[in-house]
């Protein structure tokens, strides 16, 4: 589970409801618990979906109003199918990026074949976002490891309303935060663990290209 800066709730898991086998199940709720959207997604490598388990274990809200879900994908049956060196019974970490309204921005898999000349099982167990717009994924590979990736979200310091722009609307929100009229957890522009007039000054300088 994760909660976005504007109070929306994101949940991830896996389900057999309305699917051919276990598929990832991602839900976005508003702060009252009302459903905004839900998505069931699986079988990214295109094998027979009747034999593929897609099991989601982690999720993070992204600054565009969407989220990123991390899972594992593979089969646990006598069935086995291969596309080149990529075989269904070798599990992969499975990442899905959703936008604000639940559409898939992109999905991809990661495996030991990306790094080595031999295959063994990988599954994504959890995910956290990094300040450079990427993410760190916790990998179950029979032991435990971490995978650093890029390109999960655009990191715009000062984009307080998450509209992919830095403008006067962000200044208005920041002023309201300083006055105690609103709450926002990305308002500390200068990263001094306080939100005050200095953050407003720096945000205005960013807009005027005096500070980058």
How does the language model describe each region?
Residues 1-155:
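A sequence-level/structural motif corresponding to short, flexible coil/turn segments enriched
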Residues 151-212:
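Cellulosome-associated attachment modules in secreted, modular CAZymes
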């Amino acid at each position: 589970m994760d909660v976005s800066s504007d109070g929306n709730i994101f949940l991830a898991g896996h389900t057999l409801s309305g699917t051919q086998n276990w598929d990832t199940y991602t839900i976005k709720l508003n702060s009252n618990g009302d459903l905004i959207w839900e998505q069931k997604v699986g079988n990214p490598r295109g094998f027979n979906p009747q034999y593929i388990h897609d099991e989601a274990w982690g999720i993070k809200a992204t600054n565009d109003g969407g989220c990123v879900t991390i899972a594992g994908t593979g089969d646990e049956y006598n069935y086995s199918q291969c596309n080149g060196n990529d075989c269904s019974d070798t599990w992969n970490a499975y990442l899905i990026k959703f936008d604000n309204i639940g559409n898939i921005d992109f999905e991809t898999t990661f495996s030991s074949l990306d790094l080595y000349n031999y295959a063994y099982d990988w599954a994504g167990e959890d995910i956290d976002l990094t300040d450079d717009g990427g993410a760190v994924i916790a990998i179950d590979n029979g032991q435990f490891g971490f995978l650093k990736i890029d390109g999960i979200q655009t990191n715009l310091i000062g984009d307080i309303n998450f509209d992919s722009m830095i403008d006067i609307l962000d200044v208005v929100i920041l002023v309201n935060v300083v006055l105690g009229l609103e709450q926002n957890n990305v308002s500390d522009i200068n990263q001094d663990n306080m939100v005050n007039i200095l953050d407003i000054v720096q945000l205005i300088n960013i807009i005027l290209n005096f500070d980058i």
